[in-house]
Regions:
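Catalytic center-proximal scaffold of phosphoryl-transfer enzymes
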Residues: 1-227
Length: 227
């Protein structure tokens, strides 16, 4: 697995491998996607927030006992958006279309404060994104009475509501992000070549590949010369 974790004050995100990240990801190999891997990897780390997709293994992070308290999961609005994009493209759902418009409004708020101090981001979010979020949850709940409960759209709405606390934590902390895009963009070259690395020979080979991939990404971000 390759993942990215941030230092305090930076967002954290897990993809398909595990590793610490200050400015760029550090990639580490794990033999699977079970909960033991993020638990072991982050043992001893005193961060508070873990930004991730909704993969169920990360739920275990909220149940552990630490001096700093359990991890607080921050979920990704881009992953939510993808669900409703699919519903709109495949079914032409007006509910999905309306949901996409609301998500777009959240990102418009983010665009105005991108790169600014956390306090500025937090103030803008509370003023402009807060009312959108406040109206969005009851609206989603109301849509559930209008659609078949076994439909995929109903499942997408249930999924969104089930992860609501982690989706709205960005309203209370200006250092958090709406999504995992910063990390996903960093590890995209690795993800695009994953089929070329299905057979690493053994676990040592996989660990070495993760280490080399980390160096390549760091070079791209730091303009190092590798010889």
């Amino acid at each position: 697995m390759i993942a990215a974790m941030a230092v305090p004050g930076r967002p954290s995100s897990f993809g398909h491998s595990f590793g610490p990240m200050a400015v760029v990801p550090s990639l580490h190999y794990a033999a699977g996607r079970g909960k033991e891997h993020p638990l072991n990897f982050l043992a001893g780390y005193q961060g508070r927030f873990l930004q991730c997709d909704a993969y169920q293994s990360y739920n275990a992070m909220t149940e552990i006992t630490r001096d700093n308290g359990p991890w607080r999961l921050i979920y990704c609005w881009t992953h939510v958006r993808r669900r409703f994009v699919k519903r709109f493209e495949n079914e032409g759902s007006p509910i999905a279309e309306a949901m996409l418009r609301q998500i777009a409004l959240l990102y418009q708020v983010e665009k105005t404060v991108r790169g600014k101090e956390a306090s500025v981001r937090l103030a803008a979010r509370r003023e402009h994104a807060g009312p959108i979020i406040a109206a969005l949850k009851p609206w989603l709940e109301a849509q559930m009475s209008r659609i078949p409960q076994k439909s995929q759209l109903a499942e997408d709405i249930r999924h969104t509501l089930a992860h609501w606390p982690g989706l709205i934590r960005f309203l209370n902390d200006g250092t958090l992000e709406l999504d995992t895009n910063p990390v996903e963009n960093q590890i995209r070259p690795i993800a695009l070549t994953r089929k070329n690395a299905l057979f690493a020979g053994n676990e040592v080979g996989a660990e070495n590949r993760a280490m080399l991939a980390s160096l390549v990404i760091r070079r791209e971000n730091s303009h190092w010369t590798v010889s």
